[in-house]
Amino acid sequence: MFQGASALTLDAKGRMSVPARYREALQGQAEGRVTVTKHPDGCLLLFPRPEWEVFRAKIAALPMDAHWWRRIFLGNAMDVDLDSAGRILVSPELRMAAGLEKEVMLLGMGSHFELWDSQTYIAKEQAAMAQGMPDALKNFTF
């Protein structure tokens, strides 16, 4: 289970050091294998490979009228492995798609991660908070 936010930096080659608290889980759960793809909100999704296979099967089973969503999620997916220093390489294509340059935010989302450009994430989070709670959370107890 992945949770929490980590402010990270991409190096000149587009590599991101995975926080130590996640490395052991990724090694144990997925032998260090991760799949990265686009998300329509403007971030990237990072899945441990077994979780990716579950997600991939759901996307592949979508009806024909969702063929563009298959292209977005599956057509842009790239398999990567943690290197010996605990880093993953984010491809130039995916970095460009999510506007990632140097400062990024990695968010644990349970079974997977979201990877955001730091400034984009801050702006979207502030906009969401300014809108107030959605109806789905109105009766939620904190």
From Swiss-Prot:
Q: What is one process in the GO biological process aspect for this record? A: negative regulation of DNA-templated transcription initiation
Where is the SpoVT-AbrB domain positioned along the sequence?
5-51, 77-120
- Recall the GO molecular function terms of this protein's record: DNA-binding transcription factor activity; transcription cis-regulatory region binding
Where in or outside the cell? Cytoplasm, Nucleoid
Pfam short name (any one):
MraZ
Instruction: Identify the main location.
Output: cytoplasm
State the GO CC annotations: cytoplasm; nucleoid
Has UniProt tagged this entry with the keyword Cytoplasm? yes
The record ties this protein, via PROSITE patterns, to: SPOVT_ABRB
InterPro entries attached here?
MraZ, MraZ_C, MraZ_dom, MraZ_N, MraZ_sf, SpoVT-AbrB_dom, SpoVT-AbrB_sf
- Which UniProt keywords are listed? Cytoplasm, DNA-binding, Repeat, Transcription, Transcription regulation
In the record, the note on similarity to other proteins reads: Belongs to the MraZ family.
Oligomeric state and interaction partners are given as: Forms oligomers.
Protein name as catalogued: Transcriptional regulator MraZ
Q: Which organism is it from?
A: Burkholderia multivorans (strain ATCC 17616 / 249)
